[in-house]
Amino acid sequence: MTKIALGLGSNLGDRQNNLTNAITKLSKILHNITISSILNNKAMLLPESPKEWNIDFLNCVITAKSDMDPKQLLQEIKKIEQEMGRITKEKWEPRVIDIDILLYNDLYIDTENLTIPHAGLLHRDFAIGLLAEIWSDWKYPVPGEHYQKTAFDLAKRLQK
């Protein structure tokens, strides 16, 4: 089994209940789930996004063990999002649930359909902070400026 981290967010409907329902569904396909704190965050939007999309998100991070490969995991996550009523027409529009694969242990993948670690991870301070709460010793696997820095070390930069 492989340790993974997922980022969850909701900014439509009963956001807290949406996160709880998603975690319940994920618990049927994952093992040993640990849940971070839940934070309220501003929506990330493009400058030309409609103003009505500017709805705060509730976000959390979970870690778990998975016996699926990354592609299978992504397929299962997309099924859960659809079951919960997520309809994606445009990027960054409001959503009932958003589940992202942040990490798949120390794996580095960059394909058209899947990038692990998540492409936006280092640009989402809330995700790094929540990750550090529950998997502080995870090491960034991508060569470059942050290579082999732990989630704890990456989160420390937020305090400066």
Regions found by a protein language model. Name each.
Residues 8-10, 66, 132:
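Short, structured patches in soluble enzyme cores that scaffold and shape functional sites
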Residues 1-30, 35-43:
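N-terminal beta1-alpha1 ligand-phosphate binding loop
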